[in-house]
């Protein structure tokens, strides 16, 4: 039973695209969704982070198993609106595409999940189990919305979790983690004409960076067996086969020194320098390994001068490659998207890191949502209209099939 027309489904997406949630104000989407769901007798609860940022939790059905479905409400900055062909916060329907900030990443996926819930509720299609919607704040920054929901127990009883990020018709059973590490070197300032009276923080930090580069090289020489296989994702996006060495990068541990700052002016010995690293963790080389590695190199180079801070750390999430969610997606989705579904690990990260940690409870897990991932964060972001609409039906069938397993 279809409750909403095609025009209704597009209008609902337009309504939440109009709400400007550039790294803030998700509570307005929460209030909109709460009102929408109440029209169909679906109870929901707003879980606040602060006055302007909040999550929304809603449920249909009852009892076990519990399937959590999740999407984030925040979007990245739209930049200069003059660079857009169409206004970024007005949904524009043109040439089979729905343009607007967040259409792909990921208000399209979120609204597809919400509509799927509504239509399942109205048709009394759920014979057993619970669908729990977790609409989150702050995914594009530090995942504090997802972490709050995890801390308050909303994931404690779940059997499965689907994240509706845009996946280009790829079903992800796992993804890498991500860490930000900031190394600071503190020396002693002096005039450049008398450098021996100071301690050059840049020199110290360069020594650290060079030694860490060698450590990373040594790690990659042994990083040959991977629990997470990201090769199918990469080969689909690149439209070519990749070699063994490339596969060890995509499926393995990755560390990048992306920022280096030191010194204030040319005629002074720099007293402070900082290097920032982004680290993509995997089960074989996790956050504990990374912390120990940084501390080891600091001890060797100069622990009296160097410190490390880790402002963010999100674990890799792994599940069985053929878990029941993945099985249902690969069986059902081709009927609607008219292509086979590739199964892969994801090289990025999602709210699942905060929801599940390292997934010690072996929750069935999938990242699968409408939209082409390459469109995320782009000027003139769009989602194909047919993809958005078809995923509503995909979700309905997948949710129902999973709960009836």
From Swiss-Prot:
Cofactors named for this entry: Zn(2+); Co(2+)
Keywords: Amino-acid biosynthesis, Cobalt, Diaminopimelate biosynthesis, Hydrolase, Lysine biosynthesis, Metal-binding, Zinc
Reaction equations catalysed: N-succinyl-(2S,6S)-2,6-diaminopimelate + H2O = (2S,6S)-2,6-diaminopimelate + succinate
Binding-site residues for Zn(2+) 2, renumbered to this chain: 105, 140, 377
Cofactor annotation remark: Binds 2 Zn(2+) or Co(2+) ions per subunit.
Keyword Endoplasmic reticulum found: no
Active site: 74, 139
InterPro entries for the chain: ArgE/DapE, ArgE/DapE_CS, Bact_exopeptidase_dim_dom, Peptidase_M20, Peptidase_M20_dimer, Peptidase_M20A
Residues involved in Zn(2+) 1 binding: 72, 105, 165
GO molecular function (one): metal ion binding
Recorded metabolic or biological pathway in which this protein acts: Amino-acid biosynthesis; L-lysine biosynthesis via DAP pathway; LL-2,6-diaminopimelate from (S)-tetrahydrodipicolinate (succinylase route): step 3/3
Xref: SUPFAM superfamilies: Bacterial exopeptidase dimerisation domain, Zn-dependent exopeptidases
Top-level class of the enzyme under EC nomenclature: hydrolase
GO process annotations (BP): diaminopimelate biosynthetic process; lysine biosynthetic process via diaminopimelate
Similarity remark: Belongs to the peptidase M20A family.
The protein's name: Probable succinyl-diaminopimelate desuccinylase
Organism name: Staphylococcus epidermidis (strain ATCC 12228 / FDA PCI 1200)
């Amino acid at each position: 039973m279809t409750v909403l027309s095609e025009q209704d489904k597009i209008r609902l997406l337009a309504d939440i695209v109009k709400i400007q949630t550039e790294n803030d104000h998700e509570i307005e989407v929460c209030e909109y969704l709460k009102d929408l769901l109440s029209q169909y007798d679906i109870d929901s609860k707003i879980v606040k982070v602060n006055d302007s940022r909040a999550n929304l939790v809603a449920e249909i059905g009852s009892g076990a198993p519990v399937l959590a479905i999740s999407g984030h409400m925040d979007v990245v900055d739209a930049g200069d609106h003059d660079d857009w062909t169409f206004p970024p916060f007005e949904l524009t329907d043109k040439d089979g595409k729905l343009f607007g900030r967040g259409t792909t990443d990921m208000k399209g996926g979120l609204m597809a999940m919400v509509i799927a819930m509504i239509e399942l509720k109205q048709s009394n299609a759920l014979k057993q189990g619970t669908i729990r919607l977790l609409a989150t704040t702050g995914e594009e920054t530090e995942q504090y919305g997802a972490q709050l929901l995890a801390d308050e127990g909303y994931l404690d009883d779940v059997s499965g979790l689907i994240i509706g990020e845009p996946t280009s018709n790829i079903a992800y059973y796992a993804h890498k983690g991500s860490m930000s590490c900031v190394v600071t070197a503190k020396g002693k300032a002096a005039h450049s004409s008398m450098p021996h009276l100071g301690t050059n923080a840049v020199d110290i930090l360069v020594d650290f960076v060079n030694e860490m580069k060698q450590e990373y090289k040594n790690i990659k020489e042994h990083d040959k067996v991977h629990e997470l296989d990201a090769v199918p994702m990469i080969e689909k996006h690149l439209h070519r086969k990749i070699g063994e060495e490339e596969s060890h990068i995509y499926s393995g541990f990755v560390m990048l020194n992306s920022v280096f700052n030191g010194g204030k002016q040319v005629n002074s010995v720099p007293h402070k320098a900082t290097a920032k690293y982004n680290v993509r963790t995997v089960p074989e080389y996790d956050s504990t390994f990374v912390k120990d590695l940084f501390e080891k190199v600091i001890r060797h180079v100069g622990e009296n001068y160097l410190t490390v801070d880790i402002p963010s750390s999100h674990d890799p999430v792994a599940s069985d490659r053929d878990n029941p969610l993945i099985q249902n997606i690969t069986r059902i989705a081709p009927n609607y998207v008219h292509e086979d579904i590739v199964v892969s690990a994801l090289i990025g990260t999602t709210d699942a890191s905060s929801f599940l940690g390292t997934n010690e409870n072996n929750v069935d897990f999938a990242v699968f949502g409408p939209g082409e991932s390459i469109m995320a964060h782009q000027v003139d972001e769009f989602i194909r209209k047919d993809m958005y609409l078809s995923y509503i039906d995909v979700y309905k069938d997948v949710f129902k099939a999973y709960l009836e397993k």
